[in-house]
Amino acid sequence: MAIPTYDELMSPVLKLLSDGVERSGEDITNTIANQLNLTEEERSRIYANNPKKVFKNRIAWARTYLKKAGLIESPQRATSKITSEGMKVAKSKLDKLNLKFLEQYESFKEFRHIDNSNLVENRSEKIETVQTPDEILDFVQNSYKKIYKVNYYQNSRALVL
């Protein structure tokens, strides 16, 4: 089984917290990993250029997005608890909780807002991604390494010839 993306994990996180219990991030991560029957390899997989565990990181981003939308709160460091608004959403049995759904909350829109005033071109379309910022950074770093290796190899060959 592939590790679910952070947006696919938002519903399980909200559903788990719908019992009203304040839970630690570790408890949320382990409980959902068990519910999804993730293997030990899937639970411990890390990013290529960073020591963070993929699944744990995706759960953390799912929690962050839910918190920014006001569906969960963090009463103490590294803990989460459902809010009354989160309880309403959990009870509505929404098919899929995603970024588009979260955009209805002003606090989430403010969190996602990017000041485009300094950009040369102001685009009207939004780029939606299912990758976390850490995954995007990992991809960029890998791409840079590949490009650097190719350029280094080509430059080395030119010097030898």
Task: State where each predicted segment sits.
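Hydrophobic residues on short alpha-helical segments
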Residues: 10-14
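Accessory beta->alpha helical hairpin/"wing" motif in late/C-terminal subdomains of nucleic-acid enzymes
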Residues: 73-97
